[in-house]
């Protein structure tokens, strides 16, 4: 079983079409990885599915970097 961090990074790479090595913890989805608003919505949906959790819209808007996604999932995943 891979760690939450590894799983989040794999999902980010797949959803945004970037190489996994480009997905650093400090990477911004929009500024560093080229995501647009639709990409970020799809990314949140993929994270919800992978970790069987719901991310409310007001929380999803605050998740702008890989580390923020890891932190949220770590705190809320089942």
From Swiss-Prot:
SUPFAM superfamilies in the record: ACP-like
Predominant place of localization: cytoplasm
Modification after translation (UniProt): 4'-phosphopantetheine is transferred from CoA to a specific serine of apo-ACP by AcpS. This modification is essential for activity because fatty acids are bound in thioester linkage to the sulfhydryl of the prosthetic group.
Cellular component annotations (GO), alphabetically ordered: cytosol; membrane
Keyword field: Cytoplasm, Fatty acid biosynthesis, Fatty acid metabolism, Lipid biosynthesis, Lipid metabolism, Phosphopantetheine, Phosphoprotein
Domain Carrier, chain residue ranges per copy: 2-77
Pfam (any one): PP-binding
O-(pantetheine 4'-phosphoryl)serine: modified positions: 37
PROSITE patterns attached to this UniProt entry: CARRIER (PS50075), PHOSPHOPANTETHEINE (PS00012)
Subcellular localization(s) per the UniProt record: Cytoplasm
GO biological process: lipid A biosynthetic process
InterPro entries listed in its UniProt record: ACP, ACP-like_sf, PKS_PP-bd, PP-bd_ACP, Ppantetheine_attach_site
UniProt pathway: Lipid metabolism; fatty acid biosynthesis
GO molecular function: acyl binding; acyl carrier activity; phosphopantetheine binding
Function, as annotated: Carrier of the growing fatty acid chain in fatty acid biosynthesis.
Entry's family note: Belongs to the acyl carrier protein (ACP) family.
Protein name: Acyl carrier protein
Organism field: Ectopseudomonas mendocina (strain ymp) (Pseudomonas mendocina)
């Amino acid at each position: 079983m891979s760690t939450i961090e590894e799983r989040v990074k794999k999902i980010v790479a797949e959803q945004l079409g970037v190489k996994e090595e480009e997905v650093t913890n400090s990477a911004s989805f929009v500024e560093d990885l080229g995501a647009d608003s639709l990409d970020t919505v799809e990314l949140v949906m993929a994270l919800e599915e992978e970790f069987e959790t719901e991310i409310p819209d007001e929380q999803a808007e605050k998740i702008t970097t890989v580390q923020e996604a890891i932190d949220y999932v770590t705190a809320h995943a089942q």
